[in-house]
UniProtKB/Swiss-Prot annotation:
One Pfam family it belongs to: Toxin_cobra-type
Similarity-based family: Belongs to the three-finger toxin family. Ancestral subfamily. Orphan group II sub-subfamily.
Protein name as it appears in the record: Weak toxin S4C11
Cysteines engaged in disulfide bonds, as pairs: C3-C24, C6-C11, C17-C42, C46-C57, C58-C63
Keyword Cell cycle among record annotations: no
GO cellular component term, pick one: extracellular region
Domain of life, source organism: Eukaryota
Keywords attached to this entry: Disulfide bond, Secreted, Toxin
Additional comment: The geographical location for this forest cobra population was Rhodesia.
MF-aspect GO terms: toxin activity
Length: 65
């Protein structure tokens, strides 16, 4: 699996996930509390969202754009 790994809105930095990491995630905040930041990466399980945070998980290559 390959996931995007940069926090900018338009990201093209691709990372090959390690064994056991079969999920790509992207997190962002309701109301843009941190400005336009979208932390992304690989995970074994979908990360839990913090208050006012939205986490999207998917399992195909580069799906976390």
């Amino acid at each position: 699996l390959t996931c995007l790994i940069c926090p900018e809105k338009y990201c093209n930095k691709v990372h090959t996930c390690r064994n056991g990491e079969n999920i790509c995630f992207k997190r962002f905040y309701e109301g843009n509390l941190l400005g336009k930041r979208y932390p992304r990466g690989c995970a074994a399980t979908c990360p839990e969202a913090k208050p006012r945070e939205i986490v999207e998980c998917c399992s195909t290559d580069k799906c976390n754009h």
